[in-house]
Amino acid sequence: MSRIQTRFAALKREGRGALIPFIEAGDPDAETSQTLLHGLPAAGADLIEIGVPFTDPMADGPTIQRAGRRALEAGATLAKTLAMVETFRQQDKDTPIILMGYLNPIETYGHERFCVDAAAVGVDGLIIVDLPTEEADLILPFATANGLDVIRLVAPTTDDARLPHVLNGSSGFVYYVSITGITGTVTASAEQLAQNMPRLRRVTDLPVAIGFGIRNPAQAAEAVRQGDAAIVASALIDTLAETLDDGRATDRTVPAVLDQVRQLAEAVRSARLSARGA
């Protein structure tokens, strides 16, 4: 089994959902970003999503767009993101790492070369936001050949007829975009999640991770009651940004983000226990 499959299987045996925090590679600088990445597992991250900075992140809200700009201004690149994962793997062999980004940097790097190099440094999965379902074969054969899970995004607007087509070739988990629009804006209600989860379960056995709009422990807990994982991105980046001094990291930056991850992890770990006890 892949690291992603192994982690979700272990969590299923424990009867709990996963917390997947997001950080932007190189934000606000390479050293701080690396330190933060190393601290996430001990803070309660079950899997980690790393954003690859890009100049035109169309699905990202203002918070993550600003994070990307900070990272790019500090010299972040796709190659440096891979190096960041390689350094992480020297200390952590178990926590799954998913890269989330856009197709253009991968095309510039080279589809096959990217998949070979990503697997070699210890990346486990890919989320390519703007990869059309009809063009999945640009990446899928190379990813599969190198043991990388390709994680597809589905939304409330993805109709039942299209769902199997969108999920064809998907592995690892399904990223359920709980709202329509950009990241970090509004939040789906428990009722909306409850309506949409059953139709996903009918067409896939993959774990379902819920993202976009999850900002606090209560929302993360609700996500794992309805799905299998909560992805938290903009809220963590906001916390990071609040600690910066003129765009630069301070001694509060890493501790503040890790403290927030601990609070989210505690809520996620207790969510199903409290639901059973209710």
Swiss-Prot record:
Listed pathway(s): Amino-acid biosynthesis; L-tryptophan biosynthesis; L-tryptophan from chorismate: step 5/5
The reaction(s) this protein catalyses: (1S,2R)-1-C-(indol-3-yl)glycerol 3-phosphate + L-serine = D-glyceraldehyde 3-phosphate + L-tryptophan + H2O
PROSITE patterns: TRP_SYNTHASE_ALPHA
Catalytic residues, chain numbering: 49, 60
UniProt cross-references to CDD domains, sorted A to Z: Tryptophan_synthase_alpha (cd04724)
Entries under SUPFAM superfamilies matching the protein: Ribulose-phoshate binding barrel
One GO CC annotation: cytosol
Record's keyword annotation contains Phosphoprotein: no
Stored InterPro entries: Aldolase_TIM, RibuloseP-bd_barrel, Trp_synthase_alpha_AS, Trp_synthase_suA
Family: Belongs to the TrpA family.
PANTHER family, alphabetized: TRYPTOPHAN SYNTHASE ALPHA CHAIN, CHLOROPLASTIC, TRYPTOPHAN SYNTHASE, ALPHA CHAIN
GO molecular function: tryptophan synthase activity
Organism: Granulibacter bethesdensis (strain ATCC BAA-1260 / CGDNIH1)
Self-association and partners: Tetramer of two alpha and two beta chains.
Name the record gives this protein: Tryptophan synthase alpha chain
